[in-house]
Amino acid sequence: MKGRIICAIASLLAVASTAYAQKNNDQLGQGSVVVTVVPDHSKEQSVNVTQQDIREIKVDGKDAQVTGFTPLHGANSPVELVFLIDSGARTSLGTQMSEISKFVQEMPPDTRMAIAYMVNGTAAFSGPLSSNPAQVLQALHVTAGPIGISASPYFCLSDLAKHWPSNNRSARRIVVMISDGIDYYDLRYDPEDPYVRAAVDDSVRNGLVVYFLYWADAGRISRMGFEQAAGQNLMLQVTDATGGYSYWQGFGNPVTFQPYLQDLRRRLANQFGLEFTTPLKENNAQIERLNLKLSAPSAKVDAPNRVLVHPASMAQQ
C-alpha cells in the first residue's frame, strides 16, 4: 500500500510539473531585432562589441534574457534593400540620380536590391529584387507625379511591408525612403497619427529596418515649415521604431545624398542580430516596447524601440 501511495504521489508531481512547464512555456516569448553599432569616429570601420557588453534589455518594461548577439555581415547574412521613392518629388530629384546609382553599384555583390515608387498609397515596383546593379538601375528614373501623388508615404510603407517581394525571412529587410514625410491626409503633426502607427506596426511585424532621406516635394505645401516639421517628426517615429535612421539638414533639400548614403553603407556593415526571450502577456504575437543599453562608449548604438515577440511555443511548432 505504501508503495502504491508513493507511486501515486510521484505521478501527480510529474503531471503537475509538466503542466507548470507547459504554462510557463506558453507565457515565454522570444524575438529578434537588428542592432546597429557604429564607431564615433568616421575613420574607424567597426567596433568590437560582444554579448557581454549588453548591460540591460527590457521588453514591455520587463527584463529579457539575451540568447544571441551575432555580427551580421558576409554571405551568411543576406541583405534585401528597397528604395521607396516619393513620386511627388518630381524632376528636382534628378540631381541625386547619380548618387543613388553609385550607391547601388558599390553595394556588396550578394545584396539584392529593388526600386519602388510611392503611387496612390502603394509601393509600385518597376523590377524585381536583384543582385545585378544594371538590372536594379533600369527602374531608376526621375519622378514626374503631381504633389501628394503618394497619398500618404505611410500607406506606401505599409503596403511594402505587407507585400515584401521575397519570402526570405533570414535576410535583413532594409527600406530607404526618399520623401518629405508629409501625410497629406493630416498635414499637422499628430504623434498618434493612425497611418504612421499602422506603418510602424506593419514594418515591425515584417522585420523592416527603415531609413529616411528627406527630400521636399516641389510645390506650395512642401514650402510651408510646419508641414515639413510634421513630416520629419512622423518619419522619425518610424525610423526610431524600426532601428533605422533619419537624414536631413533643416527643411531644405541637401546638395547631395552622398554623405547620407556613405553613412548608410557604414551602418549596414556594422549590424548585429540580437535574439532574446521574455515574459509574454498573451499566448499570441505582440508588438512591445524595447529598451536596450549597450556598453560601447566609443560608439553610437541604434536599436528599434518596438519589437515583435512570438510565443516560444509557436516557434517550436
Annotate each language-model stretch with its function:
Residues 21-317:
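Scaffold/interface architecture of coatomer-like assemblies
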Residues 1-4:
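Positively charged n-region of N-terminal signal peptides that target proteins for export
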Residues 7-16:
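Bacterial N-terminal signal peptides
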